[in-house]
Amino acid sequence: MEQCWRWYGPDDPVTLDHVRQAGATGVVSALHHIYDGRAWPEADVLERKRIIEAAGLTWSVVESIPVHNSFKIGAPERERYAGYYRDSIRTLATAGIKTICYNFMPVVDWTRTDLMYRLPTTGYALRFDAVDFAAYDLFVLQRKDGAASYTPARIAEAEKRLKALTSEQVDQIERNLIAGLPATERKYDRDSFREALAEYDGIGPKELRDNLAWFLREIIPVAEEEGVRMCIHPDDPPFSLYGLPRVVSTAQDARFILNAVDSPANGLTFCTGSYGTRADNDIVAMVKEFADRIHFVHLRNITIEEDGSFYEAEHLEGGTDMAHVILALMQEEARRRKEGRADWRIPMRPDHGHLLADDIGKKKINPGYSLIGRLKGLAELRGIMRAVEKFGLA
């Protein structure tokens, strides 16, 4: 597998020298300053590529080209933005960058309530507290019809939790939820967030799924012409938040997506951490089922708690059998090599990492994307890859 590393560009506190020191050879990056649906200018793409290659690395994966909200709500202007998206695909392909990750999550991207969850190891992880989330949704945001999303027991728990939280703790939860985590396209205050949610009135899973299928029909033919592999990232977490539909959460969802436009250009970013947050997702079985359409991999592990909360575990701990995931992926690589595919190598990155050692206390850290935690995770994952190779298992 191609060992990659997410890099947020020149302002990332983790430098490209650090990336090389971690042992990665590929970079996962994007033009994060262009988030409003405009086509990516060729000059900007080439400059980012130049910077990466000057450091002795390869820009292997784009993560992500943002998917404009008009696609998700089915607004008339989506026709115009589809043209911009196709232009960006062509520009990247011309520059030799042919793996493009994207997501179709409405309003909010990846979501956590706690960015500094202290672990027994004394490091820190990212956590989603289901009760804190409900308390915010019901009693701080006061979302219209919010109670319909929860059981009476959860509503009672949430009300009790809110009373136990200080105003500072509530403010911190709100910042974590709506002010924007790394790579999120939009940042909100409470009023603008309510307005964004209102755009989805009347849009349920069927409507969002239909809009995703429309998007795929518009962009996949161009990706196929250009030799580009599009790969959709799952919902994180893979269940409804704020009453919004989410349609990239299960194996059934993945089947719908791949069948909507049956093309090698239409594939998956297989994020073990996102899919793994649902106990009913059999991660190893999903990897095996969708292997030939997995174009990019995020390797991360999750520990799910009884009340539906979860936190990000060590890469080799948690609920996902990471060794068998990697084995299945490397066996797929071997199959592709035998088939003669030029794109046989699957790019992967260690997804998130604990906040550890000298990174603790640094003022400028992208949550989940500190250096040392990801370096540790990549080293552990690399160990499994080497063992698979050494023992001739793939």
Curated annotation (Swiss-Prot):
What role is this protein assigned? Catalyzes the dehydration of D-mannonate.
Q: Give me the gene this protein comes from.
A: uxuA
Q: Its Gene Ontology molecular function terms?
A: ferrous iron binding; manganese ion binding; mannonate dehydratase activity
* Family statement: Belongs to the mannonate dehydratase family.
EC no. given is 4.2.1.8
What this protein catalyses is: D-mannonate = 2-dehydro-3-deoxy-D-gluconate + H2O
- Which pathway, per its entry? Carbohydrate metabolism; pentose and glucuronate interconversion
Give the protein's recorded name. Answer: Mannonate dehydratase
Q: Does the keyword RNA-binding apply?
A: no
Superkingdom of the organism of origin: Bacteria
Single biological process term from Gene Ontology: D-glucuronate catabolic process
Q: Which InterPro entries match?
A: Man_deHydtase (IPR004628), Xyl_isomerase-like_sf (IPR036237)
Cofactor(s) the record lists: Fe(2+); Mn(2+)
